[in-house]
Amino acid sequence: MSARDPVGEGESPISGSPLREAIGRVGHALGLDAVGVADAVPTERTAFVREWWARGFGGEMGYLGRRLEERVDPRRVLPEARSMIVVGLACAPSYAPSQGLDAADSDERAPSRGRIARYAGGDDYHEVLLDRVRALEASLSHLAQRPVQARSYVDTGPILERAAAERAGLGWIGKNSCLIHPELGSHLMLGVILCDLVLPREAGVADHCGTCRACLDVCPTDAFPEPYVLDATRCLSYTTIELRGAIPEPLREAQGDHVFGCDLCQTVCPWNRSRPRTPLADPLGLR
């Protein structure tokens, strides 16, 4: 195995746990920080997702509702799917607080600077992660020594990435509705490979939010009607990115200097303290 050829030549056919371990090794060789496996069955969060959409919490993101049944059952996306390989890349540009780009680390921001979400300051994470996910997908047939039917997604298809990651043992979905990895925190970009390989499922990770309310209390627009439930129509990430019309007047004062997204509910999370990051390239010169 090498960086140029993470699979290696001449490896014998494998399946089950050895195949799962080989997939993990290839994923890490490609620069992925987390690799997990879940079975491709309807999510346990089906009822939650349907209720969330019915309550109008998805706002104008009609694409979520149009393919809702596919989102809750990966076999509707790829009928041959037996497993989901879920990967994560812990990446966030390390902005100096004085530059005004870090969501909540300092009150010493430059007065003329607006806040943008951490993930948006560098290269498009879709491209950065998708290249690695597709490389991992391309290795599957070689590892399994047979043609493998697979499809890869990085926030680009009808996949519930966080639910899949939770099922794959990458972490738990916290009170801020983000996936929290016990070692990497929640600034984790997720990718999913649906495939027809039968792989052992990972053990789940217990919810470690406990009695903490930091993410709920810091939200300037009260976007959490209850723990673990996000009303996207009140979230600054929605109103500054997804919403095509004017920002609702009741939310304008709370928006403050947020111009593209919001990280507050992640920045205050104890699980994000001193977590490793893979810096994205910075073509915009924001650092």
Which role fits each region the language model picked out?
Residues L32, A214-Y238, R244, H258-P283:
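Iron-sulfur cluster-binding cysteine motifs and their immediate structural context
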Residues T156-A163, A232-T240:
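Short alpha-helical interface patches
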